[in-house]
From Swiss-Prot:
Entry coiled-coil feature ranges: none
PANTHER family per record: ABC TRANSPORTER, ATP-BINDING PROTEIN (PTHR43335:SF8)
Superkingdom, taxonomy of origin: Bacteria
Family: Belongs to the ABC transporter superfamily.
Residues given in the record as ATP binding sites: 37-44
Protein name (record): Uncharacterized ABC transporter ATP-binding protein YcbN
Species the sequence originates in: Bacillus subtilis (strain 168)
Length: 307
């Protein structure tokens, strides 16, 4: 397998403390790689090492088949990135900021500026100074700058921060287009697991500086468990009915109102009928599946998909 990004034993130490420990990542060409982990897990530090903003203490980075160092200028020219908060010249317009980026990168396709502004829905305000932009607009401009030169690799740290739900949806669709139609490889960190679940081909989960697992979303979905989620104010009585009336024992109490029923053959209609006949009030009852969030929480708590 050939990877567009590979790290071997990547480690970073600050003031005697390892914040990234022996991380070996593998990102395939053209895929969207969702990078997940709690705050302070090391995601941003790794992204900074992949873009030469931070020097590794030890380990190896290979990008586009080349061993990566702070002098790998040709490789850096094929990487677009937005890490932490995007910074611009506030008194310049969106168009002028992107024009400066073209000059800096030696990229002489000025038509691309209007194309990327259109892609992130900023074309109508390209003449306004950036200091008038909202946080969400600056995030979109940061994404526009990252994709401006049509790089092979995009590294994006929390790219939808500050966006409203409609803006998030449009950026999600843009990422899918960049991957599927432009052939770009995307490494995206995000706290919005539902968004990553919709677009990622592979996820990597990190905790306390250590990569816990890399797994395809196909494998995560293959682990999905179907269940019925029952919400009732009469939980004790409901549990009695499930066990004694319906002989259902594979269920779990989540909180004072919510019960998850994992019986594969359980019928919602039969459960509903039995509960009603026994004077159990039903606030809601729905068939659901385990999600990326369920998997993530389970993994962070010490269980892997391969366990």
């Amino acid at each position: 397998m050939t990877y567009i990004v590979q790290t071997n034993g990547l480690t970073k130490t600050y003031q005697g403390k390892e914040v990234v420990s022996n991380v070996s990542m593998h990102i395939k060409k053209g895929e969207i790689y969702g990078f997940l982990g709690p705050n302070g897990a090391g995601k941003t530090t790794i992204m900074k090492m992949l873009t030469s903003l931070v020097k590794p203490t030890s380990g190896e980075i290979i990008i586009l088949g080349n061993k990566f160092t702070h002098t790998s200028y040709e490789v850096l020219g094929n990487i677009g990135s937005m890490i932490e908060y995007p910074i611009f010249y506030e008194n310049l317009t969106a168009e002028e900021n992107l024009d400066l980026h073209c000059e800096y990168m030696g990229y002489h396709n000025k038509k691309a500026i209007q194309e990327v502004l259109d892609m992130v829905n900023l074309k109508q305000i390209d003449k306004k100074p950036v200091k008038t932009f909202s946080l969400g607009m600056k995030q979109r401009l940061g994404i526009a700058r990252a994709i401006l030169t049509k790089p092979d690799l995009l590294i994006l740290d929390e790219p939808v921060n500050g966006l409203d739900p409609l803006g998030i949806k449009k950026i999600r669709q843009l990422f899918q287009v960049l991957s599927k139609e432009y052939g770009m490889t995307l490494l995206i960190s995000s706290h919005l697991l539902g968004e990553i679940e919709q677009i990622a081909d592979t996820i990597g989960v990190i905790r306390d500086g250590r990569l816990l697992e890399e797994v395809s979303m196909e494998d995560v979905r293959g682990q999905n468990t179907e269940y019925i989620e029952l919400v009732t104010p009469n939980q004790t009585r409901a549990c009695f009915v499930l066990e004694k009336e319906l002989q259902l024992t594979n269920f779990k109490i989540l909180n004072e109102k919510t019960i998850r029923i994992y019986e594969a053959e359980a019928s919602q209609a039969a459960i509903s009928k039995a509960l009603i006949l026994n004077d159990v009030d039903i606030e809601s009852m729905n068939k659901k599946y385990t999600s990326l969030e369920d998997y993530f929480i389970k993994l962070i708590n010490g269980n892997s998909i391969s366990a």
